[in-house]
Regions:
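P-loop NTPase motor domains
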Residues: 1-24, 73-85, 91-93, 98-249
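Glycine-rich phosphate-binding loop of nucleotide-binding enzymes
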Residues: 9-90
């Protein structure tokens, strides 16, 4: 019989071949599909294997960044030991991620603001708690473009706008629907759940970032996941423009 071996140059150690007893050293970027899954019953070492791969990537490849979404707060010790950025996300956390952070490479569109408008529409649906109509969509799209106007004119440098600025733009519109949207999102811009309406105060440029979502409550979980995934998209598009690799766990 034949034994299938995997031994890539510049790869990392994953396991040992059960037949040949040789090491399995793989570089996922050399594969047709670089995605991977870790399967196993509880206690079989899935998290340990993920941590070993994270350590290997960080130590062996200076041109790669690692981003974690941690629902159980099990990666904190590893991230802190490797001088990464552990971001606790909750309604009462001191860590804030601006939902309207935007870089010039965002999305696949030549106009990043247009791509961001789609995210803001999805976010507003979550904030309002129901599907939004055609009039509301037009108002949100217009106000998003207006909110980003000066930031875009400055080539996306400086401080990005926030949801609080977006709400002020809504209040400046003449349509009563705009006032209704502004009232609906007030809880998330100026109320007790305004954690995503403030400027980002964490290092989202670190090579190793962990988004700790354990303390996200029921009200914030859908919104929090949208913002976290959008923040990750921001980083991926930045890295793609730089020719860097991004690994998501």
């Amino acid at each position: 019989f034949r034994v299938q071996e995997v031994s890539h140059s510049n790869g990392i150690y994953y396991a040992r071949n059960v037949i040949s007893k040789n090491m399995i050293v793989a570089n996922r970027r050399n594969l047709l599909n670089g995605n991977s899954f870790i399967f196993g019953v509880s206690g079989s070492g899935k998290s340990l294997m993920a941590k070993q791969e994270i350590i290997s990537i960080i130590l062996s490849d200076n041109n790669a960044d690692v981003i974690l979404i941690d629902p159980e707060r099990e990666y904190y010790p590893l991230v802190n030991a490797m001088n990464g950025e552990a971001i606790n996300i909750s309604a009462t956390s001191r860590n804030h991620i601006n939902a309207m952070d935007l870089n010039k490479d965002y999305g696949d569109d030549s106009n990043p603001v247009s791509a961001k408008c789609e995210f803001i529409l999805s976010l507003c649906e979550q904030l309002i708690g129901s599907e939004i109509g055609a009039k509301q969509r037009s108002i949100i799209d217009r106000c998003t473009a207006n909110t980003y106007r000066y930031y875009q004119q400055g080539n996306f440098q400086g401080t990005p706008p926030t949801l609080q600025g977006f709400r002020r733009e809504l209040l400046d519109q003449d349509e009563p629907e705009a006032k209704e949207i502004a009232l609906a999102i007030e809880l998330f811009t100026h109320g007790s759940l305004n954690t995503f309406a403030k400027p980002t105060n964490v290092d989202t440029d670190n090579r190793l970032i962990c988004y700790d979502i354990l303390d996200l409550g029921k009200q914030l979980m859908p919104i929090g996941m949208l913002v976290v995934l959008d923040s990750i998209l921001n980083r991926i598009t930045q890295n793609r423009a730089k020719g860097k690799n991004t690994f998501i766990f």
